[in-house]
Regions:
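Short helix/loop capping segments that flank catalytic or ligand/cofactor-binding pockets
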Residues: 13, 43-45, 65-67
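Catalytic-pocket segment enriched in acidic/His residues
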Residues: 64-187
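Short, basic and Ser/Thr-rich N-terminal targeting/leader segments
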Residues: 4, 13, 26-30, 51, ...
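A generic local secondary-structure boundary/capping motif
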Residues: 17-26, 40-47, 74-78, 92-96, ...
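Short Gly/aromatic-enriched secondary-structure transition segments
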Residues: 45-56
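Extended, compositionally biased flexible segments
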Residues: 1-21
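Short, structured patches in soluble enzyme cores that scaffold and shape functional sites
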Residues: 5-7, 28-38, 56-61, 90, ...
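Hydrophobic beta-sheet segments that form the core/acyl-binding groove
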Residues: 15-22, 30-32, 36-40, 106, ...
Length: 187
């Protein structure tokens, strides 16, 4: 599953996340972001990592009702303003020994809800860069989010639960830093 997020969805690592008007199921997703360092088109898997500038922490915030219901579309549910907090910094590729061996976690209001590792990614980083570059040119600064471990709100048991104004998300990836976002209602 691939989708694009607009620049307007980008925000800083500790900026508030705005829950859009009409949102009912705003959800969290801690993810490893792969930052492209040089133009990549039709790149082989063997060469793919040489096009990576580095790695960042990403919170792929999602509005599940917009995404999956009401004639939902992935872009609509993923693209709201502030729905892609990135940072706190870019760690260059040479400083990450193995990007497929990083622990990542996310807490909501102090409760650990996601605790995983990039070793469990469905698709490896080289495979993602190669695959995507086969149908769209990747440019320096493009970010590929690699997917999230179990524990999103949609998957909570016994019942799903979602973010509301006042909730605080805190998340991190080993060696890439931490983020903290407070959820606010759209004005």
């Amino acid at each position: 599953m691939l989708f694009l997020k607009p620049n307007s969805s980008l925000s800083g690592p500790n900026d508030p996340v705005t829950i859009p008007r009409g949102a009912l199921k705003t959800d969290w997703e801690v993810e490893l972001g792969v930052v492209i360092g040089s133009k990549a088109s039709y790149v082989s898997q063997a060469d793919a990592l040489s096009y990576v500038a580095g790695y960042v922490l990403v919170n792929d915030v999602s509005e599940r009702a917009f995404q999956l219901e009401r004639g939902g579309q992935w872009d609509k549910g993923k693209a709201a303003d502030t729905f892609t907090p990135v940072g706190p910094w870019l760690v260059t590729a040479d400083e990450v020994a193995d990007p497929q061996q990083l622990s990542l976690w996310l807490e909501v209001n102090g409760k650990r809800v996601q605790d995983g590792t990039t070793a469990n990614l469905i698709f490896g980083i080289a495979e993602l860069v190669s695959y995507i570059s086969g149908f769209m040119t990747l440019h320096p600064g493009d970010i590929i989010s690699t997917g999230t471990p179990a524990g999103v709100g949609l998957g909570q048991k016994p019942e799903p639960w979602y973010l509301k104004a006042g909730d605080v998300m805190r998340l991190g990836i080993a060696g890439l830093g931490e983020q903290s976002q407070t959820c606010v209602a759209a004005a």
